[in-house]
Regions:
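Active-site helix of classical SDR
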Residues: 39, 75
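Conserved NAD(P)H cofactor-binding loop of Rossmann-fold oxidoreductase domains
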Residues: 7-12
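Substrate-binding pocket helix/loop in short-chain dehydrogenase/reductase
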Residues: 15-16, 23-28
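SDR active-site lid
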Residues: 92-157
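Residue(s) in the substrate-gating loop at a strand-loop-helix junction
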Residues: 59
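Active-site-adjacent segment of SDR/Rossmann-fold oxidoreductases
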Residues: 64, 85-96
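Active-site loop immediately N-terminal to the catalytic Tyr-X3-Lys motif
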Residues: 17, 66-70
Length: 185
């Protein structure tokens, strides 16, 4: 096995206290435990192929948490940490572990209705000025991640901006996130 692409996830948004516990459990099961199970299943095969790679889809939500997406963000932070830890653990076996951290990608998931709104997520994002990246950008980033040396590969302008702000001016992100949250309430 040359590459296993661990790409599964679902998001159930809304205020933390309003999201049913079974939705939290489902996100944990799919977004984090699913990635763990995929890694467990793949390791015996990846370790037999020098230069192989486990590629996990993380998310830009694994860069900085967002109100209304608390458990989703927590699962993506978990994938980020798992990726970093396994990259260290599996290196002696010749296995690289990488992640993709996409922001908003032009897929049908954006056509779903935003939490607490009658508009699609796509409409909400466009109105807020967020970039929606084409799926081809993800394919290019996946190849770059598999062949490259970086543990995490950001996908899309929004992910790059978020990573920059989180590193250099995290207080600004927090203020903007709180303003956005206040506007929703």
């Amino acid at each position: 096995l040359d590459v296993l692409f661990n790409n599964a996830g679902l998001g159930k948004g809304g205020p933390f206290a309003d999201v049913p516990p079974e939705d939290h459990d489902l996100m944990l099961d799919v977004n984090l435990k699913g990635v763990i199970r995929g890694a467990e299943a793949a390791f015996p095969y990846l370790s037999k192929t020098p230069g192989s790679c486990l590629l996990n889809t993380c998310s830009a939500a694994g860069i900085y948490g967002s109100g209304g997406l608390a458990v989703y963000a927590a699962t993506k932070f978990g994938v980020r940490g798992l990726t970093e830890a396994l990259d260290i653990e599996w290196a002696p076996h010749g296995v690289k572990v990488r992640s993709l951290m996409p922001s908003f990608i032009d897929t049908p998931i954006l056509d779903g209705i935003s939490s607490g709104s009658n508009r699609s997520s796509r409409e909400t994002l466009k109105e807020a000025g967020f970039e929606i990246s084409p799926v081809e950008l993800v394919a290019e980033a996946a190849w770059t991640a598999i062949e490259g040396k970086k543990v995490h590969t950001l996908v899309g302008k929004t992910a790059g901006q978020l990573a920059f702000l989180a590193r250099f001016v995290p207080g600004m992100i927090r203020k903007r996130a709180k303003r956005l949250q206040d506007a929703r309430v």
